[in-house]
Protein backbone atom coordinates (compact mmCIF):
# COMPACT_ATOMS: atom_id res chain seq x y z
CA UNK A 1 0.00 0.00 0.00
CA UNK A 2 1.43 3.41 -0.95
CA UNK A 3 2.49 5.79 1.82
CA UNK A 4 1.20 9.26 0.86
CA UNK A 5 3.51 11.05 3.32
CA UNK A 6 6.56 9.34 1.82
CA UNK A 7 5.31 10.15 -1.68
CA UNK A 8 4.90 13.84 -0.82
CA UNK A 9 8.35 13.95 0.80
CA UNK A 10 9.82 12.36 -2.34
CA UNK A 11 8.08 14.95 -4.53
CA UNK A 12 9.34 17.75 -2.28
CA UNK A 13 12.87 16.32 -2.30
CA UNK A 14 12.83 16.20 -6.09
CA UNK A 15 11.78 19.85 -6.26
CA UNK A 16 14.33 20.97 -3.64
CA UNK A 17 17.15 19.04 -5.31
CA UNK A 18 16.34 20.55 -8.70
CA UNK A 19 16.21 24.06 -7.23
CA UNK A 20 19.47 23.51 -5.33
CA UNK A 21 21.18 22.36 -8.53
CA UNK A 22 19.80 25.36 -10.47
CA UNK A 23 18.12 22.84 -12.77
CA UNK A 24 15.45 25.16 -14.13
CA UNK A 25 13.55 22.60 -16.20
CA UNK A 26 13.43 19.92 -13.50
CA UNK A 27 12.43 22.49 -10.86
CA UNK A 28 9.53 23.90 -12.88
CA UNK A 29 8.41 20.38 -13.84
CA UNK A 30 7.50 19.93 -10.16
CA UNK A 31 4.71 22.52 -10.54
CA UNK A 32 1.44 22.44 -12.43
CA UNK A 33 0.92 25.17 -15.05
CA UNK A 34 -1.76 26.76 -12.83
CA UNK A 35 0.53 26.93 -9.79
CA UNK A 36 0.73 30.18 -7.84
CA UNK A 37 3.75 31.60 -6.02
CA UNK A 38 4.10 34.11 -3.20
CA UNK A 39 7.65 35.18 -2.37
CA UNK A 40 8.76 37.90 0.02
CA UNK A 41 11.29 38.89 -2.64
CA UNK A 42 8.69 39.75 -5.29
CA UNK A 43 6.12 42.55 -5.06
CA UNK A 44 3.02 40.52 -5.86
CA UNK A 45 1.62 37.09 -6.51
CA UNK A 46 3.08 35.17 -9.43
CA UNK A 47 -0.23 33.80 -10.72
CA UNK A 48 1.12 30.93 -12.84
CA UNK A 49 4.14 28.74 -13.39
CA UNK A 50 4.82 30.72 -16.57
CA UNK A 51 4.95 33.96 -14.55
CA UNK A 52 7.55 32.47 -12.18
CA UNK A 53 9.51 31.05 -15.13
CA UNK A 54 9.60 34.54 -16.70
CA UNK A 55 10.75 36.08 -13.40
CA UNK A 56 13.45 33.37 -13.03
CA UNK A 57 14.68 34.07 -16.57
CA UNK A 58 14.73 37.82 -15.87
CA UNK A 59 16.76 37.30 -12.68
CA UNK A 60 19.25 35.12 -14.55
CA UNK A 61 19.57 37.56 -17.48
CA UNK A 62 19.67 40.82 -15.51
CA UNK A 63 21.31 39.81 -12.24
CA UNK A 64 23.25 36.64 -13.02
CA UNK A 65 21.07 34.74 -10.53
CA UNK A 66 22.18 31.18 -9.84
CA UNK A 67 21.27 28.78 -7.03
CA UNK A 68 24.36 27.15 -5.51
CA UNK A 69 22.80 24.92 -2.84
CA UNK A 70 19.55 24.30 -0.99
CA UNK A 71 19.01 22.42 2.28
CA UNK A 72 15.67 21.43 3.82
CA UNK A 73 15.12 20.98 7.58
CA UNK A 74 12.22 20.99 10.07
CA UNK A 75 10.00 19.18 7.58
CA UNK A 76 6.30 18.52 8.05
CA UNK A 77 3.58 17.02 5.85
CA UNK A 78 -0.13 17.49 6.48
CA UNK A 79 -2.49 15.37 4.38
CA UNK A 80 -6.03 16.56 3.64
CA UNK A 81 -7.63 14.14 1.21
CA UNK A 82 -6.02 14.56 -2.20
CA UNK A 83 -4.02 17.61 -1.04
CA UNK A 84 -0.81 17.74 0.99
CA UNK A 85 0.80 20.72 2.69
CA UNK A 86 4.58 20.44 2.94
CA UNK A 87 6.32 22.97 5.16
CA UNK A 88 9.98 23.29 6.05
CA UNK A 89 12.86 25.58 6.78
CA UNK A 90 15.00 26.10 3.72
CA UNK A 91 18.59 27.32 3.66
CA UNK A 92 19.66 28.52 0.23
CA UNK A 93 22.98 29.76 -1.15
CA UNK A 94 22.69 31.74 -4.33
CA UNK A 95 24.79 34.15 -6.30
CA UNK A 96 24.09 37.18 -8.45
CA UNK A 97 25.78 40.43 -9.38
CA UNK A 98 25.43 41.30 -5.66
CA UNK A 99 27.64 38.34 -4.68
CA UNK A 100 26.82 35.21 -2.71
CA UNK A 101 23.71 35.34 -0.52
CA UNK A 102 22.71 32.85 2.17
CA UNK A 103 18.98 32.86 2.82
CA UNK A 104 17.20 31.29 5.80
CA UNK A 105 13.51 31.00 4.99
CA UNK A 106 10.31 29.15 5.75
CA UNK A 107 8.51 27.61 2.83
CA UNK A 108 5.18 25.96 2.25
CA UNK A 109 4.53 23.94 -0.89
CA UNK A 110 1.01 22.65 -1.49
CA UNK A 111 0.72 19.46 -3.55
CA UNK A 112 -2.26 17.69 -5.08
CA UNK A 113 -2.44 14.08 -6.09
CA UNK A 114 -1.72 13.55 -9.78
CA UNK A 115 -2.17 9.88 -10.53
CA UNK A 116 -2.09 7.01 -8.09
CA UNK A 117 1.30 7.68 -6.46
CA UNK A 118 2.36 11.02 -7.93
CA UNK A 119 2.03 14.49 -6.40
CA UNK A 120 2.42 17.83 -8.19
CA UNK A 121 2.88 21.21 -6.55
CA UNK A 122 0.30 23.91 -7.20
CA UNK A 123 1.28 26.59 -4.67
CA UNK A 124 4.52 27.79 -3.08
CA UNK A 125 4.86 30.43 -0.36
CA UNK A 126 8.25 31.64 0.86
CA UNK A 127 8.89 33.95 3.80
CA UNK A 128 11.95 34.90 5.85
CA UNK A 129 12.59 32.75 8.89
CA UNK A 130 11.88 34.87 12.00
CA UNK A 131 15.24 34.01 13.54
CA UNK A 132 17.18 34.29 10.28
CA UNK A 133 20.40 36.15 9.87
CA UNK A 134 20.60 36.96 6.19
CA UNK A 135 23.93 37.82 4.61
Where in this protein do the model-derived segments appear?
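Short, cysteine-centered beta-strand-loop-beta hairpins and adjacent loop/turn segments enriched
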Residues: 93-101
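Short beta-strand edge/turn micro-motifs at domain boundaries
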Residues: 102-134
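C-terminal-biased regions
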Residues: 3-4, 64, 70, 84, ...
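Short, low-complexity N-terminal intrinsically disordered segments enriched in polar/charged residues
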Residues: 1-33, 51, 132-135
